[in-house]
């Protein structure tokens, strides 16, 4: 199979780094750093599309749907990284945000030969998750042409799910297939074709926004505090106390007492302190208001 990389921005040569092998270490790093500065600006231009995807994910969550990432190589690993951080940060279920990578778990640590070129594998991995119309698929590939991702996107479209993509090449097969295309154009890489660099950084910034935005919209952040964090280790036990103190301006003793009364459920402890309620009353208000602290407190007045 012949692949034409001629017109891909991510495969073009960067004039700023053409002689990078002759530079001193500090000058080499300055070139890399100067190129990295362009990434956030490229992502900024895609904020309207990112916003659309955040809203689509939020609606999917409300209906019991999931966010599924699919990618190969660096793109797949970044999706898995973002998905894996949601449960410890937001107390979400592991199956709510899932990352798929061409070649499966083996490919997380080392490349799996030809896996990314298999469209059927992309479709099969989605079928293995019982992917359906309630879910949202985000295909990730710097090139915008990875067959594994395109196969997954085609299947997602066939079941009438919302399909988005993150690519660093405009007018790609993925952007044509997606309902919503996020395309931060970061330009040529410092090392030609090494899309784990600027393209990968752009993808990570977008992924951060997608899950953070959807979790905020789902009531898992109060102010800027991660109020659904679960105390799964000593550090997080202390973080819970700190969150309750900062959210309510109460004493450490009050925070500890409230958390103990509600079995370490941070949101309940906050509502208890702010609304002066028992653990049972606070939990009921939260349940009645879909976990949103502000709405729960307002309803309790």
From Swiss-Prot:
Catalysed reactions, semicolon-separated: N-acetyl-D-muramate 6-phosphate + H2O = N-acetyl-D-glucosamine 6-phosphate + (R)-lactate
UniProt name for this protein: N-acetylmuramic acid 6-phosphate etherase
CDD domains: SIS_Etherase
Subunit and interaction comment: Homodimer.
Residue spans crossing the bilayer: none
E.C. code: 4.2.1.126
Alphabetized GO MF terms: carbohydrate derivative binding; carbon-oxygen lyase activity; ether hydrolase activity
Pathway: Amino-sugar metabolism; 1,6-anhydro-N-acetylmuramate degradation; Amino-sugar metabolism; N-acetylmuramate degradation; Cell wall biogenesis; peptidoglycan recycling
Native organism: Photobacterium profundum (strain SS9)
Biological role: Specifically catalyzes the cleavage of the D-lactyl ether substituent of MurNAc 6-phosphate, producing GlcNAc 6-phosphate and D-lactate. Together with AnmK, is also required for the utilization of anhydro-N-acetylmuramic acid (anhMurNAc) either imported from the medium or derived from its own cell wall murein, and thus plays a role in cell wall recycling.
């Amino acid at each position: 199979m012949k692949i034409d990389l001629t017109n891909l921005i991510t495969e073009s040569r960067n004039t700023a780094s053409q002689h990078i092998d002759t530079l001193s270490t500090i000058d080499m790093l300055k070139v890399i750093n100067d190129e990295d500065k362009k990434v956030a600006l490229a992502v900024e231009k895609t904020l309207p599309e990112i916003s659309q995807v955040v809203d689509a994910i939020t609606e999917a969550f409300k209906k019991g749907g999931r966010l599924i990432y699919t990618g190969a190589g660096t793109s797949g690993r970044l999706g898995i990284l973002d998905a894996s951080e949601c449960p410890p940060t937001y107390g979400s279920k592991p199956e709510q945000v899932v990352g798929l990578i061409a070649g499966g778990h083996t490919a997380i640590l080392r490349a799996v030969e030809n896996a990314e070129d298999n469209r059927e594998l992309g479709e099969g991995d989605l079928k293995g998750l019982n992917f359906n119309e309630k879910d949202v698929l985000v295909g990730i590939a710097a090139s915008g042409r990875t067959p594994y991702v395109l196969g997954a996107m085609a299947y997602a479209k066939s079941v009438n799910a919302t399909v988005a993509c993150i690519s660093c090449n405009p007018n790609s097969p993925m952007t044509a297939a997606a309902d919503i295309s996020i395309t931060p154009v970061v330009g040529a890489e410092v090392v030609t074709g090494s899309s784990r660099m600027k393209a990968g950084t752009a993808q990570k910034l977008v992924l951060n926004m997608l899950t953070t935005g959807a979790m905020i919209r789902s009531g898992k952040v109060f102010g800027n505090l991660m109020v659904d964090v679960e105390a799964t280790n000593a550090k997080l036990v202390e973080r819970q106390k700190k969150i309750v103190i900062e959210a309510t301006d109460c004493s450490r003793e009050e925070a500890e007492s409230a958390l103990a009364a509600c079995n370490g459920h941070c949101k309940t402890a906050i509502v208890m302190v702010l609304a002066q309620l028992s653990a049972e009353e606070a939990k009921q208000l939260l349940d009645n208001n879909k976990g949103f602290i502000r709405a729960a407190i307002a309803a309790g007045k």
